[in-house]
Amino acid sequence: MSHSAPPKPATARRSEALTGEIRIPGDKSISHRSFMFGGLASGETRITGLLEGEDVINTGRAMQAMGAKIRKDGDAWIINGVGNGCLLQPEAALDFGNAGTGARLTMGLVGTYDMRTSFIGDASLSKRPMGRVLNPLREMGVQVEAAEGDRMPLTLIGPKTANPITYRVPMASAQVKSAVLLAGLNTPGVTTVIEPVMTRDHTEKMLQGFGADLSVETDKDGVRHIRITGQGKLIGQTIDVPGDPSSTAFPLVAALLVEGSDVTIRNVLMNPTRTGLILTLQEMGADIEVLNARLAGGEDVADLRVKASKLKGVVVPPERAPSMIDEYPVLAIAAAFAEGETVMDGLDELRVKESDRLAAVARGLEANGVDCTEGEMSLTVRGRPDGKGLGGGTVATHLDHRIAMSFLVMGLASEKPVTVDDSTMIATSFPEFMDMMPGLGAKIELSDAR
């Protein structure tokens, strides 16, 4: 879908206690990879709990365009894959809409095939840099025709046979790591990724689960060496996708901020590379109880019981950024209601998300009376524990779903209402948000504000 749909502003107002039990939609990272690896594997893959947001569906469509058979059967998605090395050249450009993850991972997956593959996306995705993924692919022999600055629309022309490479990832990016590993699937020999700072590791865990010959070694300095032997066989799997921790963040922070709240969130992914927000909120004094911790499909999963809490400001260690990069906007909202100062640093990755997310958060906070300072890659927020004087502003969301949801959470606890200029793009990651939150007692509604 393109974001040419008319914008739908929404407003959140101060709410009474939020109570109830919810199950969060499936994790976006695991959902993307389930479609990709299922579409590539031999035999049948069955997925339940898939996040059916537009981003993930676009990844599924791309796999279909390259030969995978995908159908919905009740609550499950059934995929009959093509077999590793057997993707077909798509007849038309692959349209990823707003999905950076889907686009970048698929570039890795198809780049080493001897075929031409074109990628297009919406206005927001077409602004985002793709060079970080294209550079290692070029080293493997892939030719690239791209818009200026290595942006989409772009076309990859694969080599007859790709070269295996050893690639040191220059920034903390799971997408770059994953793209190189996926390119290695169709490359003879061993492709190695060296990762100085660990990022979410779903690609490694899931590829091993599908039968790839992949090993991970961590040296004494914490640097990870990930090796994949190409041209092996992948076998279809059964996957139950756990709830997305990045989506969990919104009802979780809302329950912490709205007085008297007591909310249980079921089936949340607790992979240690994704729990930076929960750790940070607990340091701030959040009452978050981890219940029924268990393993599901090789991933840590648990239920969370969250109660309203008085929060205090903290300094968030910059090395925690990779494990909570998508959660900083909603952490900034929590910080706005915490006593004292919260300092977030090492946020350079936020500048190249769906929007310049760091600037968007700072502008939104200022528009709603929050005392904050934006640095080059940092944000400092000075909180108002009672929410007095906060709210009353309209936030420019810049087509960014996480900005929209974060500021709607803010309005539930601020003295005055908070309006976001558009809520349509929330559907890219959390289509149920606008119904699920009012189900807990949140006062969020579409507004006529222009």
Curated annotation (Swiss-Prot):
EC number: 2.5.1.19
Pathway: Metabolic intermediate biosynthesis; chorismate biosynthesis; chorismate from D-erythrose 4-phosphate and phosphoenolpyruvate: step 6/7
RNA-binding listed as a keyword: no
Pfam families reported for this sequence: EPSP_synthase
Record protein name field: 3-phosphoshikimate 1-carboxyvinyltransferase
Active site residues of this protein: 326
Signal peptide span: none
Reaction it catalyzes: 3-phosphoshikimate + phosphoenolpyruvate = 5-O-(1-carboxyvinyl)-3-phosphoshikimate + phosphate
Organism: Brucella anthropi (strain ATCC 49188 / DSM 6882 / CCUG 24695 / JCM 21032 / LMG 3331 / NBRC 15819 / NCTC 12168 / Alc 37) (Ochrobactrum anthropi)
Assembly mode: Monomer.
Gene3D superfamilies: Enolpyruvate transferase domain
Gene name, Swiss-Prot/TrEMBL: aroA
Keyword field contains Amino-acid biosynthesis: yes
Record function comment: Catalyzes the transfer of the enolpyruvyl moiety of phosphoenolpyruvate (PEP) to the 5-hydroxyl of shikimate-3-phosphate (S3P) to produce enolpyruvyl shikimate-3-phosphate and inorganic phosphate.
